[in-house]
């Protein structure tokens, strides 16, 4: 009985030792859970980040950080107002660059 218990233990150990962890399902992790269509005042913006779609999140994400509160808002990249905001910021940045 002792030899069979040791043999079973060794078989289990060798089986578990060779097994690799493989995720059963892919979880999608986007930064933005809820998006806002509300217009944002350029003067109240501290910064705006644009995160492109990736394997971990299929959506383009635009995150605005407000100056006074430091609040981060996820903006709808498909909204006309947000598209024009991004365009205005890009234009402003291109004027600064030599």
From Swiss-Prot:
Annotated GO CC locations: external side of plasma membrane; extracellular space
Citrulline modified-residue sites: 26
GO MF term list: chemoattractant activity; chemokine activity; CXCR chemokine receptor binding; CXCR3 chemokine receptor binding; heparin binding
GO biological-process terms attached to the record: adenylate cyclase-activating G protein-coupled receptor signaling pathway; antiviral innate immune response; cellular response to interleukin-17; cellular response to lipopolysaccharide; cellular response to virus; chemokine-mediated signaling pathway; chemotaxis; endothelial cell activation
Keywords: Chemotaxis, Citrullination, Cytokine, Disulfide bond, Inflammatory response, Secreted, Signal
Gene3D superfamilies found in the cross-reference section: 2.40.50.40
Entry-linked Pfam families: IL8 (PF00048)
Claim: Coiled coil is one of the keywords in the record: no
SUPFAM superfamilies: Interleukin 8-like chemokines
Stretch forming the signal peptide: 1-21
Disulfide bridge map: 30-57, 32-74
Domain of life: Eukaryota
Location(s), subcellular: Secreted
Keyword Signal: yes
PANTHER family: C-X-C MOTIF CHEMOKINE 10, SMALL INDUCIBLE CYTOKINE A
Entry's family note: Belongs to the intercrine alpha (chemokine CxC) family.
Role description: Pro-inflammatory cytokine that is involved in a wide variety of processes such as chemotaxis, differentiation, and activation of peripheral immune cells, regulation of cell growth, apoptosis and modulation of angiostatic effects. Plays thereby an important role during viral infections by stimulating the activation and migration of immune cells to the infected sites.
UniProt subunit comment: Monomer, dimer, and tetramer. Interacts with CXCR3 (via N-terminus).
Protein name according to UniProt: C-X-C motif chemokine 10
Lineage, top ranks: Eukaryota, Metazoa, Chordata, Craniata, Vertebrata
Gene symbol of the encoding locus: CXCL10
């Amino acid at each position: 009985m002792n030899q069979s218990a040791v043999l079973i233990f060794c078989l289990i150990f060798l089986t578990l030792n060779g097994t690799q962890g493989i995720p059963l399902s892919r979880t999608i992790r986007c930064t933005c859970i809820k998006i806002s269509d509300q217009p944002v005042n350029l003067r109240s913006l501290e910064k705006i980040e644009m995160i492109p779609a990736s394997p971990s999140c299929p959506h383009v994400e635009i995150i605005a950080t407000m100056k006074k509160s430091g609040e981060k808002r996820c903006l709808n990249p498909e909204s006309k107002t947000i598209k024009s905001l991004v365009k205005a910021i890009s234009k402003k940045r291109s004027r600064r660059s030599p």
